[in-house]
Amino acid sequence: MPSTRRQQEGGGADAETHTVYGTNLITNRNSQEDENVVEEAELKYGASHVIHLFVPVSLCMALVVFTMNTITFYSQNNGRHLLYTPFVRETDSIVEKGLMSLGNALVMLCVVVLMTVLLIVFYKYKFYKLIHGWLIVSSFLLLFLFTTIYVQEVLKSFDVSPSALLVLFGLGNYGVLGMMCIHWKGPLRLQQFYLITMSALMALVFIKYLPEWTVWFVLFVISVWDLVAVLTPKGPLRYLVETAQERNEPIFPALIYSSGVIYPYVLVTAVENTTDPREPTSSDSNTSTAFPGEASCSSETPKRPKVKRIPQKVQIESNTTASTTQNSGVRVERELAAERPTVQDANFHRHEEEERGVKLGLGDFIFYSVLLGKASSYFDWNTTIACYVAILIGLCFTLVLLAVFKRALPALPISIFSGLIFYFCTRWIITPFVTQVSQKCLLY
């Protein structure tokens, strides 16, 4: 009898050893499969959000190009200029034009720096109501005043004369709905629509009221400032991002377009490193850990908690001892507990999906559109298409760098510098070359 009992115990130990070994093999195989799924999800997530960002940028630029080619009001200057472009004297000297344009660009840059620093100071000392009031006034002017001017010029260009009451009613509803969607609550698509139209209107204002050469200098110096403000250790926009992450809060509305949701953060393409405010409960902490808030680019795709999944099919044979039965029961409980978080994790993943996305500042929308709109004002489609392609290539390259470095990066420099190079090369080299070749009947 003792020998029989020892044989049974030895057989039970061997069986348990084989079970644990088989479980480890299954677990390793499942972990490898999970890693492959995560990598595939990262690629799909990144590609989808790049497309979701290209579409609104293209729509904003298309609206500006369409307006520049159909409404003469925005393509003609009429001698009016912005207050912060004081050097507008007429001259034929290229050197004087260049110096005056550079002076105007530097004055405008000083205004941008001053407003940025003022915004940082308000945010640092938590003057949130003052900041929101400032942004609400800006949105109000864009949605009511500038939209009214735009609609008026559109009606003039297409020779349409509706009732004044009808126009006022429509513009009033449009403005009120926009204020609600941007600063309060509203459907996602409607929020995105209003942010795109606001960016296009602001770009049209810059194109109309900035002097001819000043536009190009402004684009250059603003791109350089974007580099300094984001990448330097004491840069204001970098400080803004870090402060917001420390406080674990969004900054302000009406500043950011997100490919996932309108979730205001910064004036640059940024990576969010904030942790999720929901803490795991004690029951969940045994099987999974709460994962941090996701980045706003494809390089930080959310990773589901790795849970060891063991098949629930556990056979308890009649000749096993009571201890073996007890161990099997414990194993079943652990398996069921490991399976439970998947439902909660799925809901949490859906919640995170609503708040993630590649975030691009409205300033980037505006200056992309300024570049393309100014290029289209000369009615040269070769130059316009070249600038459009350059902007998208630069934006795509910026997103690649964002995924590699996983930190806030400026979205203007690469796209704007590429657009400027493509513009001048196409306008001064390629277009004259193609024209001459066509005139010589060498190209059909």
Curated annotation (Swiss-Prot):
The chain crosses the membrane at residues 46-66, 102-122, 131-151, 164-184, 190-210, 213-233, 360-380, 385-405. The active site is at 226, 364. Residues 1-45, 123-130, 185-189, 234-359, 406-413, 435-444 are cytoplasmic. Its main location: endoplasmic reticulum. Residues 414-434 dip into the membrane without crossing it. Expressed in most neurons. Residues 67-101, 152-163, 211-212, 381-384 are lumenal. It is a multi-pass membrane protein. Disulfide bonds: none annotated. Residues 282-300, 315-329 have a biased composition (Polar residues). GO terms for molecular function: aspartic endopeptidase activity, intramembrane cleaving; endopeptidase activity. Residues 275-331 are annotated as: Disordered. One of its GO terms (cellular component) is endoplasmic reticulum membrane. Gene3D superfamilies: Presenilin. A motif (PAL) lies at residues 410-412. One of its GO terms (biological process) is Notch signaling pathway. SMART domains: PSN. Keywords: Endoplasmic reticulum, Golgi apparatus, Membrane, Notch signaling pathway, Transmembrane, Transmembrane helix. It holds the Pfam family Presenilin. PANTHER family: PRESENILIN, PRESENILIN HOMOLOG. Homodimer. Component of the gamma-secretase complex, a complex probably composed of the presenilin homodimer (sel-12, hop-1 or spe-4), nicastrin (aph-2), aph-1 and pen-2. Interacts with sel-10. Belongs to the peptidase A22A family. Probable catalytic subunit of the gamma-secretase complex, an endoprotease complex that catalyzes the intramembrane cleavage of integral membrane proteins such as Notch receptors (lin-12 or glp-1). Provides the major presenilin function compared to hop-1 and spe-4. Required cell-autonomously for correct neurite connectivity of the AIY cholinergic interneurons and their correct functioning in thermotaxis. Required for mesodermal patterning of muscle function. Promotes basement membrane gap formation during tissue remodeling. This is Presenilin sel-12. It comes from Caenorhabditis elegans.
